Regions:
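Catalytic machinery of carbohydrate-active enzymes
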Residues: 1-341
Length: 341
């Protein structure tokens, strides 16, 4: 009997891919000999490969006509048992449709935000699950997996680990807390000034020095954070994705909003303090498998009560993020890392 051949479509972003890994892990667990081809944006090829779940990664730039033509041609040259669109957007659903995949699995209209997308699927899955990772798991179940989600073990290349260890050693950083102030939506970000005040409080009360994850476009935020830290000397670090993984893996705790680095830290089994405002942590919060939770991974989510969930992108901090105080986050970090307050 020929091996099953699955096309997994999840183009981005960092957090969304992290929340897709458990569902694909369940698919791999149920079909260990399957050929699983993951279609994603070139930026995330390294991340997908770090999961070890794929047989092959194909990349596509959906805004580049030549890239679209190339990937559609490659899809048409192959044969597939099914394509599973975990993204649920027009740009993701059209690829297996135009690529001639005859069995195309995706969410029903009740789950998808872009109107009309399910018309491109041959099989539409209704889900009652709340968290997106478990919603994704329902697609894997529909494709034949024995369970919806399974544990994921991300691999960090030795070169990136050695590079980060060398830098941290030079800074005399053995135990540290990572602060991740940035994010794709500024509305989901906690103010950089408060991160700075948190850094100062942690240094003064626990002796721990913080490392600031400064991603693309975060230089100004990092500068404000350092300037607000009262001489706590947080170390600003910028690196590639593999180095970020090594940095997060070695942290005592990671603090940030509903952003990729926080979800990546959770996938690496590093405790997180996640700060939520406009988005709902029940749907988009840090997701740990039952195995990770039973092994003692601690995650703490802070969100003001009564906040109305919205996915509207805004360039200003959402008012609900301002209700989260420095003292509340400090207390959560202390609980997370097991030090007295």
């Amino acid at each position: 009997m020929p091996e099953p051949r699955f096309l997994v479509v999840r183009l981005g972003s960092l957090g969304d891919i992290i929340h897709t890994f458990p569902a694909v892990a369940a698919l791999r667990e149920s079909f260990p000999e399957a050929r699983i081809v993951w279609l994603t944006h070139p930026r995330w090829s390294f991340l997908v490969k770090s999961s070890g779940l794929e047989s092959e990664v194909q990349t596509v730039e959906t805004r580049a006509l030549s890239s679209l033509r190339d990937v559609i041609r490659r899809l048409r040259q192959d044969s597939w048992n099914a394509a599973i669109d975990y993204q649920g957007l027009w740009k993701s659903a059209m690829l297996p449709f135009l690529g001639g995949v005859t069995r195309r699995i995706g969410f029903s209209s009740a789950t998808i935000r872009e109107f009309g997308v399910p018309v491109l699927y041959t099989e539409r899955v209704k889900t009652s699950k709340e968290h997106v990772a478990e919603q994704n798991g329902d697609l894997s179940l529909h494709a034949g997996a024995q369970r919806g989600t399974a544990p994921v073990n991300l691999q960090i290349p030795e070169r990136e680990q050695a590079s980060v260890c060398s830098i941290l050693r030079a800074q005399r950083l053995e135990r540290y807390v990572v602060l991740s102030p940035g994010g794709g939506w500024r509305s989901k970000c906690w103010p950089a000034e408060r991160f700075g005040a948190l850094s100062r409080k942690l240094r003064e009360s626990t002796g721990l020095r913080c490392v600031v994850n400064s991603g693309p476009g975060d230089n100004d935020l990092a500068a404000v954070l350092v300037g607000s830290s009262g001489g706590a000397e947080p170390f600003v670090y910028s690196g590639n994705l593999g180095e970020l993984m090594a940095l997060l893996k070695g942290a005592a705790c990671v603090v940030g909003g509903d952003t990729g680095p926080v979800h990546l830290a959770t996938a690496l089994n590093t405790p997180v303090v996640a700060l939520f405002g406009p988005t709902d942590p029940a749907r988009n919060g840090p997701y740990s498998s039952a195995e990770a939770t039973s092994s003692g991974q601690k995650n703490i989510v802070l969100r003001a009560s009564g906040v109305r969930t919205t996915h509207a992108r805004d360039s200003q901090t959402h008012p609900s993020m301002l209700t989260i105080t420095v003292d509340a986050v400090f207390d959560a970090v202390c609980r997370c890392i097991g030090v007295p307050r």
